[in-house]
């Protein structure tokens, strides 16, 4: 019924020796219940701001302990800590840290499993946060040029952008379009504009 390990141990400390079995049972039950289902309620939020502005603290203050934080992007153990009970998935310190095509899958509503060292882990999270010091438009700047179609798909995955300011202000943009309009940013990153001809830039905007 959704009782956590801590709550079980509070009821009866004797179950401490059975925690591993309980975790396995919980994993099997949740995988059976949630596996293959479309996450129609999935919300993907991009959070950015300078170090020390409270980006990570915001997650822990607003959500339960069922949070999986990804910090290691090297090797095949990135998702080792992911559990079926994790409703919130956080990509911390994200700087083009995962290939764009993989990120598109992880942020999609359709059933997907993420690779880990021992067995692939299904992603059941209904809230995904991408946290970075980088402004949103800096992510995947190369792909904006060489694979604009995939980049457009990435833009469609993002439901909300939150900007954390040094003075403590949090500005929320309820869509990528709202953010781009407010910041007067073109679809192609401003970090790459000097390397692209006017004709190429216009074609990319027009989806050609």
Model feature map: region roles:
Residues 2-41:
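N-terminal pre-Walker A segment at the start of P-loop NTPase domains
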Residues 32-35, 55, 74-78, 114-118, ...:
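A generic local structural motif
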Residues 38-41, 63, 81-86, 121-124:
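Flexible, charged surface loops at secondary-structure boundaries
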Residues 41-64:
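Glycine-rich phosphate-binding P-loop
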Residues 45-47, 68, 89, 129, ...:
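Hydrophobic/aromatic beta-strand patches that form the interior of the parallel beta-sheet core
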Residues 48-49, 93-95, 133-134:
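Structural motif
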Residues 65-99:
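AAA+/P-loop NTPase substrate/partner-engagement loops
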